[in-house]
Amino acid sequence: MIQSQTFLNIADNSGARKIMCIRVVGTTYQKYAYIGDIIIAIIKEVVPNTKMEKSEIVRAVVIRTSKEFQRDDGMRIRSDDNAAIIIDQKGNPKGTRVFGPVLQELRQWNFTKIISLAPEVL
């Protein structure tokens, strides 16, 4: 579960390393973001000599959470960290590589580009 003020690792090569969630995109009463949800975040840590800047406001999609995710068949999947991928306004990732596994449920939520870049799909 990702809420406001939560720090997330970045799982792509867009230039940011850590972001902090400031808002969950969607309804006004939704407090938490889960896997596949879009958040608005601030970049807190960047890789040197990249286009991204610290304190820049970006949109990101959550791909891994420490809180377990339960599939329809009852299987629960949990990750070691909270991770996200920075996206543009159209939903395409800004990076060209994705690090770490992603869930196959992202395909249902129209993030097929992220699925195709991922090295492992669970």
From Swiss-Prot:
Keyword Transmembrane helix (UniProt): no
GO cellular component term of the entry, any: chloroplast
Gene Ontology molecular function, alphabetical: large ribosomal subunit rRNA binding; structural constituent of ribosome
Gene3D superfamilies: Ribosomal protein L14
GO biological process: translation
HAMAP family noted in UniProt: Ribosomal_uL14 (MF_01367)
Family from the record: Belongs to the universal ribosomal protein uL14 family.
Its biological purpose: Binds to 23S rRNA.
Subunit structure: Part of the 50S ribosomal subunit.
Protein name: Large ribosomal subunit protein uL14c
Organism for this UniProt entry: Gnetum parvifolium (Small-leaved jointfir)
